[in-house]
């Protein structure tokens, strides 16, 4: 796919120094206690001074989230328990006449939340009514409305956000624990001369009585009180909580309510970003308001009817590591409108100026993001069919998202469908798919192994010096690419697992995601 960028209006970032109120209850760690010792205080015994009973058994665990996370960061906005008053988490400027503009902090009365991702709301500030993106609001006076609460994001995603070079030491967020139901985790950026920038994670335990604590000697009636206390006192943490982790506005789910099949006239193509065998990719604007990427397909590339049917499935695939499909123009020439990311394709990024500065930990993290997106595709019983660096898009802070999932199946070009010639990506395709057309999630796993070589070689074409026919013959005879220069043997071993001859013996994307361990994080708790 081509490159993509953010909207013309820069997303506002949320960075605030905390001026917390006095805590109502505190105790304190022993002065001699080190950060590592605070990882899981009293992890194997009941609290000695307790205001209630511990709801979950504290325990250590290092692991990764494999749940169906769909946005990053995710903030719940669903109506529950009759709650109808919500607070705006971000500014929103309307894109259509039926949208409602609002400012961060504005209180909104939800009129109707039964129509999917766009809710009908009434502003208690302006008195106006219109549709709002549901992921831009949270129930009033709830933890979801707190700027430091990031909800169900993964440990790895919290590290990526906190390790932004612009974040000072003590930047923090609170998220749901991945390993203990009902518990939370406090993630804090730190720095030391030996390790450089790193992130420490402190599990927040919950009492049956409703209180919270990191160490049983210091308990609080609410998470807000806990954050307020530790923003004034490090008290055993690596650093006091100095700044809330900044984050950009999330993508809305679609361009607007009912904006799916859109008129061609609503799109303005502004700059060509790339060109392939079957079309072009443009930077553009929808409705004169919204920055988007537009993929234009040459007439005859695929059946408009088949494309529209497939697109209905594709738009339901929503994950933080999948490029979001916004809208389509279904008459030829077909236009595909997607979210617009800032750094273009991963292949161009690796081969460009920025690629020179990427080190192994960053490359492995990018691979883990791709595996996360593909693990979701795997859970949804979908198949990509064309997984390679050219079809991964890169955004700010090295965020990677999978694009073009499912489109390869619809291409009607004779040379492509015959799986031969320059148009077909033989070097990325599993032998059973290239020879017999057996495309499955396991053939995607093979392609992921090839993509790992693209990452570790900064965009080198796989099987250097070999033509397509030779690649097929050699792979059938058992040849596998050797370990790339400066690539760890453990990573090459993972590649070879992806290239096992029997598709059923290849690992799952869930397994691959877990194996791509972070390389720059200090384990403290969770």
From Swiss-Prot:
GO terms for molecular function: ATP binding; non-membrane spanning protein tyrosine kinase activity. The modification Phosphotyrosine is found at residue 416. It is an enzyme of class 2 (transferase). Residues 148-245 form the SH2 domain. Residues 267-517 form the Protein kinase domain. Residues 1-52 are annotated as: Disordered. This is Tyrosine-protein kinase transforming protein Src. It comes from Rous sarcoma virus subgroup C (strain Prague). The lineage of its organism: Viruses, Riboviria, Pararnavirae, Artverviricota, Revtraviricetes. The gene is V-SRC.
């Amino acid at each position: 796919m081509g490159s993509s960028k953010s909207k013309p209006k820069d997303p506002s970032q949320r960075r605030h120094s905390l001026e917390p109120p006095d805590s109502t209850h505190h105790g304190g760690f022993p002065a001699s206690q080190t950060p590592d010792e605070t990882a899981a205080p009293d992890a194997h015994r009941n609290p000695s001074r307790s205001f209630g009973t511990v709801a979950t058994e504290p325990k250590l665990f290092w692991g990764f989230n494999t749940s169906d996370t769909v946005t990053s960061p995710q903030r719940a906005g669903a109506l529950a328990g009759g709650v109808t008053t919500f607070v705006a988490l971000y500014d929103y400027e309307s894109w259509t006449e039926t949208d409602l503009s609002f400012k961060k902090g504005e209180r909104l009365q939800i009129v109707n939340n039964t129509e999917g991702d766009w809710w009908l709301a009434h502003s208690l500030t302006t008195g106006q009514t219109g549709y709002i993106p549901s992921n831009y609001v949270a129930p009033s006076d709830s933890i979801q409305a707190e700027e430091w609460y990031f909800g169900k994001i993964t440990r790895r995603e919290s590290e990526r956000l906190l390790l932004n070079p612009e974040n000072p030491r003590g930047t923090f967020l609170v998220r749901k624990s991945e390993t203990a139901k009902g518990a939370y985790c406090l993630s804090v950026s730190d720095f030391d001369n030996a390790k450089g920038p790193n992130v420490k994670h402190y599990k927040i335990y919950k009492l049956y009585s409703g209180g919270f604590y990191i160490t049983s000697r210091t308990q609080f009636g609410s998470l807000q009180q806990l954050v307020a206390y530790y923003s004034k006192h490090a008290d055993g943490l690596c650093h006091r909580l100095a700044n809330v982790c900044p984050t950009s506005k999330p993508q809305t789910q679609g361009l607007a309510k009912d904006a799916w099949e859109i008129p061609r006239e609503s799109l303005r193509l502004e700059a060509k970003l790339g060109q392939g065998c079957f079309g072009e990719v443009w930077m553009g604007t929808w409705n004169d308001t919204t920055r988007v990427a537009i993929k234009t397909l040459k007439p005859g590339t695929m059946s408009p009817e088949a494309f529209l049917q497939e697109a209905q499935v594709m738009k339901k695939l929503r994950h933080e590591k999948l490029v979001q499909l916004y809208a389509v123009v279904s008459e030829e020439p077909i236009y595909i409108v997607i979210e617009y990311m800032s750094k273009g394709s991963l292949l161009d990024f690796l081969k460009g100026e920025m690629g020179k500065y990427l080190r192994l930990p960053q490359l492995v993290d990018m691979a883990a993001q791709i595996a996360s997106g593909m693990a979701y595709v795997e859970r949804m019983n979908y198949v990509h069919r064309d997984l390679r660096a050219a079809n991964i898009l890169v955004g700010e802070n090295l965020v990677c998202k999978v694009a073009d999932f499912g489109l390869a199946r619809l291409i009607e070009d004779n040379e492509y469908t015959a799986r031969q010639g320059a148009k077909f990506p033989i070097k990325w395709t599993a032998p059973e798919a290239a020879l017999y057309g057996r495309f499955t999630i396991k053939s995607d796993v093979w392609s992921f192994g090839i993509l790992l070589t693209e990452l570790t070689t900064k965009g080198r074409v796989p099987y250097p010096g070999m033509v397509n026919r030779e690649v097929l013959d050699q792979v059938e005879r058992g040849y596998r690419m050797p370990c790339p220069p400066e690539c760890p043997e453990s990573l090459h071993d993972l590649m070879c697992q992806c290239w096992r001859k029997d598709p059923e013996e290849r690992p799952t994307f869930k397994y691959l995601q877990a194996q791509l361990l972070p390389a720059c994080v200090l384990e403290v708790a969770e």
